[in-house]
Amino acid sequence: MSGRFAVILAAGQGTRMKSKLYKVLHPVCGKPMVEHVVDQVSKLEFDKTAVIVGHGAEEVKKTLTEKIEFVMQPEQLGTGHAVKCAEHLLASQKGTTVVLCGDTPLITAATIKKLMDTHEANGAKATVLTAHAPDPTGYGRVIRGNQGQVEKIVEHKDASVDELAIAEVNTGTYCFDNEALFEALAEVKNENAQGEYYLPDVIGILRQKGETISAYQTDSLSETMGVNDRVALSQAEAAMRKRINEEWMRQGVTIIDPQTTYISADASIGQDTVLYPNTSIKGPSVIGEDCVIESGTEIASATLGRGVHVCSSVISNSVVADGSSIGPFAHIRPGSDVGENVRVGNFVELKKASIGTGSKVSHLTYVGDAEVGSDVNVGCGVVTVNYDGKNKHKTIIKDGAFVGSGSNLIAPVEIGERAFVAAGSTITDDVPSQALSIARSRQVNKDNYVKKDV
């Protein structure tokens, strides 16, 4: 019985990135490059997926949680050597093997499937994913025979002047008959400018044996882009951002200026939501339908319900329920839970705070480590004083309470249901339900305190 296998090459050090971070772990739209590739592969029915790792292997293993197998390439001796490291997993298997690069984050499942379909339809032993490159510098060239058949692939550094003029390039993605692949790998030599074992040499070896070699030429060179330095990383980021934004617009999201709008690969956005220019949706954020996200807003790994309005604010690792309004210039820090129809206004900071339905925290307020009930009014300049220099303490404000402007609530403290705190109070003890608490000195006016002749 024939199987389908995938090998993802992710062992390169990536010295041109000039980074301490392992190359394939550099993010594109918030997700590591290699994870983009694995996600696309996982959409197809492969019996086994192997990721070849070397430098930073443990970090790659931590990043990828799919059911895949990791193969160590102890020395980076070329792409042919990398695939050969998976011999113990695949060599005895009948079927088709797709080889992809872990630094090609734009590759899609649709293109991989077309490559495999072409391979199987032609009864080929190897099929190369190729593309037309206006500037083929750095790419391996696809050399074809008189009948248009693929004869071999020549790396840029080893190409002749005539071969360098060829614009059809090897993208680094292949489909092989699995048994033929590993038989040919045993014959690959490292007699080249780099002294490495090149996977493309398998094409020439199979062709010399009279085997059928085919090619599938994609019309999207950008999809096959390999990322080797920060310039290419920025180009991949721009292409992925464009793809993501256009997909959300097709699904009913209004993006006023796609060029200045960032949406992570893991985000989800509901229909009829409007994103203004200079907005950033990071991580696995979920934004409901009919929301308005105005300029200058950053939403990071947060969940927004339906009809939420956010203006020039930051919301991180928190939940905002239906119909609530945030900002301008509010900061919703991790662990906060904002209920339905809540108003969190300008220059308000929440941290590990829950705000009940219909409550208002409108101006210049800090609410941290707090539980605020429903229909509560928190006045301007209120501070929950939660830190004693060593430990954090909780403030509880129950349903219907009113906290006057300029009040300090010294935690741990509880404000009872429908209780009132007078403006300017410093509350150190619990306030009973329906009570009025005034915790400030009486006003004393000193007549003639300032002499008239001063």
UniProtKB/Swiss-Prot annotation:
Active-site residues annotated for this sequence: 363
Linker: annotated span: 231-251
Keywords carried by this UniProt record: Acyltransferase, Cell shape, Cell wall biogenesis/degradation, Cytoplasm, Magnesium, Metal-binding, Multifunctional enzyme, Nucleotidyltransferase, Peptidoglycan synthesis, Repeat, Transferase
InterPro entries in the record: Bifunctional_GlmU, GlmU-like, GlmU_C_LbH, Hexapep, Hexapep_transf_CS, NTP_transferase_dom, Nucleotide-diphossugar_trans, Trimer_LpxA-like_sf
Compartmental location: Cytoplasm
CDD domains for this protein: GT2_GlmU_N_bac, LbH_GlmU_C
Pfam family, one: NTP_transferase
Residues annotated to bind Mg(2+): 103, 228
Positions of region (N-acetyltransferase): 252-454
Enzyme Commission number(s): 2.7.7.23, 2.3.1.157
Cofactor binding annotation: Binds 1 Mg(2+) ion per subunit.
First-level EC class: transferase
Reaction catalyzed: alpha-D-glucosamine 1-phosphate + acetyl-CoA = N-acetyl-alpha-D-glucosamine 1-phosphate + CoA + H(+); N-acetyl-alpha-D-glucosamine 1-phosphate + UTP + H(+) = UDP-N-acetyl-alpha-D-glucosamine + diphosphate
SUPFAM superfamilies according to UniProt: Nucleotide-diphospho-sugar transferases (SSF53448), Trimeric LpxA-like enzymes (SSF51161)
Domain of life of the organism encoding this protein: Bacteria
Family the entry assigns: In the N-terminal section; belongs to the N-acetylglucosamine-1-phosphate uridyltransferase family. In the C-terminal section; belongs to the transferase hexapeptide repeat family.
NCBIfam families, sorted: glmU (TIGR01173), PRK14354.1 (NF010934)
Reported function: Catalyzes the last two sequential reactions in the de novo biosynthetic pathway for UDP-N-acetylglucosamine (UDP-GlcNAc). The C-terminal domain catalyzes the transfer of acetyl group from acetyl coenzyme A to glucosamine-1-phosphate (GlcN-1-P) to produce N-acetylglucosamine-1-phosphate (GlcNAc-1-P), which is converted into UDP-GlcNAc by the transfer of uridine 5-monophosphate (from uridine 5-triphosphate), a reaction catalyzed by the N-terminal domain.
Name of the protein: Bifunctional protein GlmU
Organism: Shouchella clausii (strain KSM-K16) (Alkalihalobacillus clausii)
